[in-house]
Amino acid sequence: TAEVDGLQWKYVDFERRQILIRETLVDYVLETTKTPGSVREIHMSQMVYDALINQFEATGSQSEFVFCNKKGNPLRHRDVSKRIWYPALRYMGLKSRKPYQTRHTAATLWLASGENPEWIARQMGHTTTRMLFTVYSRFVPNLTRKDGSAFERLMITTMKGDDHE
């Protein structure tokens, strides 16, 4: 949440479709990221790109911060949670959860859809895939085969391919 709170337009590269994570905002104070591994470039999906274009049209000339109030001051995630997030969850009849948990949802959905685990780890600011598999893989049923059949199919396919050359 501190990365979102501290996101500034100078760190949004529309041309390369990247969000550069360089600073965080904690209690209205800009700070460097928690760890050197947290400094990263996040790839913008088409939906994120489109949403940020719309946000830029709405607030780009108003503030250096991507997410700001009418005065141009950065939004505080606590205020957004209280005024928007939790009421929206109640309205939709969903179980209450912290906005930060959307991070877990994203990781789980990326894994379930077959995205490259190294790419996911980089997007999330992990320096290795270890944390990714430790925390998130348990939420994805049948993420990996446990009987060796995938390797066997690969070998059979490879050997059959060699016969035809």
PLM features: what roles do these ranges have?
Residues A2, E118, R130:
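Key DNA-contact positions within bacterial/archaeal DNA-binding proteins
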Residues A2, L7-K10, R83, T105, ...:
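Structural detector for helix-capping/boundary residues
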Residues L25, M124-A150:
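Catalytic-site neighborhood detector that most strongly recognizes the C-terminal catalytic loop/helix
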Residues R16, L20, A51, D79-P87, ...:
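Generic alpha-helical secondary structure signal
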Residues G6-V12, A121-T127, S137:
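A short, basic/aromatic helix-end/turn motif that makes direct DNA contacts
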Residues I42, D50, F56-L75, K82-R122, ...:
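Short, basic (Lys/Arg/His-rich) helix/loop patches that form interaction surfaces
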Residues R16, D27-D50, N54, A58, ...:
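C-terminal secondary-structure termini that scaffold catalytic or DNA-interacting sites
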Residues T1-L20, L25:
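Short, charged phosphate-coordinating catalytic segments
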